[in-house]
Amino acid sequence: MTPTNVVSMDFETKEAMEDFLETYERDSPTLYPDAEMLLMIKTTETSCVGVSVYPNEEARSLAGSRTSGKLKYLVKENFRLSGDMVVKHVFTNKGELND
């Protein structure tokens, strides 16, 4: 079991999203120290999707309780999906698959 969160976020302005992304890039390793992977994808000028992967449910729950509200003030609207990652392919070198 690999607990995974997928969060879609919309922002009032491009600047608000840029502020969020700057803060997330700088602070997310300390806000989510138990995460195995943190990924943020810009989908429009004012929205993005984040993916976070944890080693177990306890780590995911702890991260949620530790960070709720710390970055939320920058987000206009969001929705969260939680589940278990069932397929993972990581390519570290072109042509090589490392799972």
Question: What do the PLM-derived regions correspond to, one by one?
Answer:
Residues 1-69, 73-99:
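Short S/T/G/P-rich N-terminal loop/turn motif that feeds into the first structured element of a domain
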